[in-house]
Amino acid sequence: MQTLHALLRDIPAPDAEAMARAQQHIDGLLKPPGSLGRLEALAVQLAGMPGLNGTPQVGEKAMLVMCADHGVWDEGVAVSPKIVTAIQAANMTRGTTGVCVLAAQAGAKVHVIDVGIDAEPIPGVVDMRVARGCGNIAVGPAMSRSQAEALLLEVSRYTCDLAQRGVTLFGVGELGMANTTPAAAMVSVFTGSDAKEVVGIGANLPPSRIDNKVDVVRRAIAINQPNPRDGIDVLSKVGGFDLVGMTGVMLGAARCGLPVLLDGFLSYSAALAACQIAPAVRPYLIPSHFSAEKGARIALAHLSMEPYLHMAMRLGEGSGAALAMPIVEAACAMFHNMGELAASNIVLPEGNANAT
């Protein structure tokens, strides 16, 4: 059975030759070179992923939603009752939440995964529960390092198993009351930003309570002293089980050479952790939408990512990742279905990158 160290060691590099061939093919399609903008770059990125066998393609699609509760909820950083995590997880099994509707529209299966819900087990939910909620990061670590490592490995294996069954495009999502607080703490640590710059309203926290949330994030960092150069240390000290789970999806998909669509702010924090743990993960990550949460711009700048969609969304759950799946499929359709200039009797001047 593969260890976490072995999994990280075996993440493949992108296939540069396949990417060069893809770029050459795209430049010869029935359009001025570069005129489809970032769709062309996305197709080239996909072509370089070894799990796609040298060509942009989408087989089965899966949304992995990590559900967990957080001890820091006790600090008054969220307006929703903690039980909402369990209620919404149950609603996900019925297909009635935002991510479920959008994933169904995109033709993706939603995997609802309990990595730490503070409630009795929920029928229809995948059980990877570590504990009934993580620790309160304002007074101590979220979890032990061994718990974080074990969950990373379990989720990575689950992701790779899905790849073996035909999934070639993953999306990540989360569900957990108060989870924007640990996400903000992680972004603060990884980017070196003050909590004031990255703490937002989450699920409609009143403005009068923002200062408390900022103070909680600062206390969490001061008490736990996470090492920004050690992604697992940051996850275990100021993260949460859902954030660890999303990180595990990214590690597992990268190990299989397959793409992962990020969602919003919560997933940005997990992506920062994943890239710190294994920089080789970065080429497999695809940003979906620009989260309306305050710290989004800072996190994305640190990841050097520009999302494809600007929808003023901050629901979470993986909703933005599901919404962006058709964009990935559009890049593949462009690559495979457009005609070629050579067969059309059209000759374009060299360097013409503008549509006529």
UniProtKB/Swiss-Prot annotation:
Pathway: Nucleoside biosynthesis; alpha-ribazole biosynthesis; alpha-ribazole from 5,6-dimethylbenzimidazole: step 1/2
Domain of life of the source: Bacteria
GO molecular function, one term: nicotinate-nucleotide-dimethylbenzimidazole phosphoribosyltransferase activity
UniProt keyword annotations, A-Z: Cobalamin biosynthesis, Glycosyltransferase, Transferase
Pfam family, one: DBI_PRT
GO biological process, one term: cobalamin biosynthetic process
Catalytic activity: 5,6-dimethylbenzimidazole + nicotinate beta-D-ribonucleotide = alpha-ribazole 5'-phosphate + nicotinate + H(+)
The EC number(s) this enzyme carries: 2.4.2.21
Catalytic residues (UniProt): 317
Function: Catalyzes the synthesis of alpha-ribazole-5'-phosphate from nicotinate mononucleotide (NAMN) and 5,6-dimethylbenzimidazole (DMB).
Subunit and partners: Homodimer.
Record-linked NCBIfam families: cobT_DBIPRT, PRK00105.1
Family: Belongs to the CobT family.
Alphabetical list of PANTHER family matching this protein: NICOTINATE-NUCLEOTIDE--DIMETHYLBENZIMIDAZOLE PHOSPHORIBOSYLTRANSFERASE
Protein name as catalogued: Nicotinate-nucleotide--dimethylbenzimidazole phosphoribosyltransferase
